[in-house]
């Protein structure tokens, strides 16, 4: 992230610098509690603090830093599955964890009306037929007339050979082959 400007110096950072002269002021990713143990990749970088407790202008970036979903501006997740999708998307977790999480999750699927109990599949832009499911109401496409809640494991049993697309209109989506959910 060398093209991004250095982190803004906040009043809290200035207070900390005044209390700790002749040190480094470390900028921590927002996903972490500054008073807890921070992994090396959770430190954005540091400003030098002089003998008077003033923060220097130069910011030293941590080359090991990997931004968390929060640092990337992703919205607060509303479920464990959304949280995992964000951590996978930001490069902190493995895609291999996704199938088991989908099977354990409550998902929202298309429903044409309140009595619709079918699993509906739709073609994507290339013509491939997929079953869409959403992790929360916020991700339900506005064009859907309705939705119903199902367990991932129950939905997996009804996919046939059709892949499952999670949060089809984004911003974070995932495509899982039906075979990955058996």
Task: Give the location of each predicted region.
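An interfacial alpha-helical scaffold signature
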Residues: 1-182
């Amino acid at each position: 992230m060398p093209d991004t400007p250095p982190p803004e110096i906040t009043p809290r950072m200035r207070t900390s610098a005044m209390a700790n002269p002749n040190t480094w002021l470390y900028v921590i990713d927002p996903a972490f509690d500054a008073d807890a143990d921070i992994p090396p990749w959770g430190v954005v970088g540091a400003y030098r603090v002089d003998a008077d407790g003033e923060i220097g202008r130069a910011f030293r970036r941590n080359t090991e830093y990997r931004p968390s979903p929060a640092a990337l501006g992703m919205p607060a997740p509303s479920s464990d599955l959304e949280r995992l999708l964000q951590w996978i998307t930001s490069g902190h977790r493995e895609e291999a964890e996704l199938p088991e999480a989908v099977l354990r999750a409550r998902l929202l699927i298309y429903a044409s009306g309140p009595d619709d109990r079918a699993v509906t599949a739709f073609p994507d832009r290339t013509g491939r037929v997929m079953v869409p499911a959403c992790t929360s109401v916020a991700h339900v496409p506005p064009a859907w007339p309705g939705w119903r809640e199902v367990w991932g494991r129950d939905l997996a049993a009804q996919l046939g050979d059709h892949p499952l697309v999670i949060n089809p209109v984004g911003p974070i989506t995932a495509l899982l082959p039906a075979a990955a959910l058996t």
